[in-house]
Amino acid sequence: MSLVVRPMRDDESRSFLEIQRAAVRGLAAKDYPASVIDAWAPLPVTDTAVAFFRVNHDSEIRLVAELDGELVGIGALVLAESELRACYVVPDAARRGVGSALVAEIERLARHHRLTHLELLSSLTAEPFYRALDYEVEERVEHVLGSGGRMPAVKMRKTLHQGAALGG
């Protein structure tokens, strides 16, 4: 098994969104009603959605994960907000170390940029994953989706310790 985490290329915007939607629909559907899933991960991925996604590209460091040459995961870091913005893995690659590798690279980048902590808004589905990576629950909240719908979510935080991860 060959796992590579790398910066997203400009021509991978649609794939980034498709992975997010596949992860939400395949993994989070057990924890949320269909109305939330449809608002959170609308299909198909439209040209308008891709264009909107590209507008925000300067504010995020976006990563992709390749497993044996196939894109299977995505991640995003917003330095200005010390926020782990996204970590999604397609269902077929779940529980194979892809998400952990994405978070490790996001944390490495955050340390490199001298961030002292990371915050995130987790789905109910991903909360145990982040807990296993030493993120702590700050509070349970209702996240307002772009459609105006609401979904239960978990605000989490992790203190980052500077060290060997400061390289490259």
Give, region by region, the residue ranges found by the protein language model.
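Conserved GNAT acetyl-CoA-binding A-motif
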Residues: A110-S123
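Extreme N-terminal starter segment of soluble prokaryotic enzymes
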Residues: S2-V4
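Conserved active-site tyrosine of GNAT-family acetyltransferases
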Residues: Y130, Y135
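Conserved short alpha-helix immediately C-terminal to the canonical SAM/SAH-binding motif I
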Residues: L102, A126-F129
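Conserved catalytic-core motifs of GNAT/GCN5-like acyltransferases
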Residues: E119-L121, E136-K155
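Terminal substrate-recognition subdomain of acyl/acetyltransferases
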Residues: G149-G168
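Glycine-rich ATP-binding loop(s) of histidine-kinase-like ATPases
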Residues: A94-R96
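Acetyl-CoA-dependent GNAT
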Residues: P7-D11, E18-D92, V103-E105, L109, ...
